[in-house]
Amino acid sequence: MTAALQIDGLFKRFGEQQVLNGFSLQVTRGEVVGLLGPNGCGKSTVLNIICQLLQADAGQVQLAGQPMIEQSAHARTRIGYCPQQSALYPDLFPQENIQFFARLYGVPAAQRNAVVAELMERFSLAPYAATRSGLLSGGWQQRLSLAVALVHRPELLVLDEPTVAVDVEARMDLWHLIEGLRDSGTTILLTSHHLAEAQRLCNRVALMRNGKVVAEGSVPELISQVPGQAVVKVQSEDNQAVIQRAIELGWSVRQHAGKISLLLPHNLNLREVGDALDGSKVNAISIDPVTLEDAYLELVGDNSSIS
């Protein structure tokens, strides 16, 4: 089966900074794939190259088996793009924005009104038909941006941080909308800083570091790459003593912001962990199953920009 999106060996440099360093990824038709990684790892650059807003220094992007470089402007009509920064015209009403982009993307004139009406209803925008787009809340602007990105029924939907600037309630609403798109078979590539978002929406997650994919798979597959079956979180008066004792026991140790997490090589109960760390001035211990966050920290090693 031909991949909906095939990316091979992308390189991109800005001045002295090598942003992409052999980035490769495949997205299957009907799949939702999330890109996770720290700030500056190249996520948005990848999306901009896919959408032909940037040109790679080397490498190839294929859409449904056809090289993007050979399709020129036509390729853009096969992709729906929802950028981080709103591309809406603030003085237009929602239906006018949809109408404008329908014309821009080449939707036949005879179909435009029906497309606008369908998207206004699908994204519950009808109550805001008399509100200028720039006056909508962040969540409703993002809904409208999703509608605009789908106006030409693209083969691939690209979402750059789709819920980055909205409140929790709006984020839940947007997740529900994206889940509906996923369940209807829409092929989606998205970037996110929210691990819960990736876990909820994505069939697969690709973890990025230094401009390339360092691990990819379903959430269970990524978790299986963590060398431990449980995570012990420790509060201690003497972190160094805990770390030293854990190393002696052969446990993997991770420390961030003054907190210690231990990846156990086998399942232990709290009493056994406490006994093993006896004398290390431990105040509190908790044991949790390995999560996507643990996989991210183990495989990428940076949690400064995730939540």
Would you name each region that the model predicts?
Residues C51:
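Helix-to-loop junction immediately C-terminal to a conserved catalytic motif
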Residues L157-E161:
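Catalytic Walker B motif of ABC-type/P-loop ATPase nucleotide-binding domains
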Residues Q99, R103, A110-Y128:
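Conserved ABC ATPase "signature" region
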Residues D91, R132-L136:
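Conserved ABC ATPase signature
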Residues G59-E70, H74-A75:
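Conserved ABC transporter NBD signature motif
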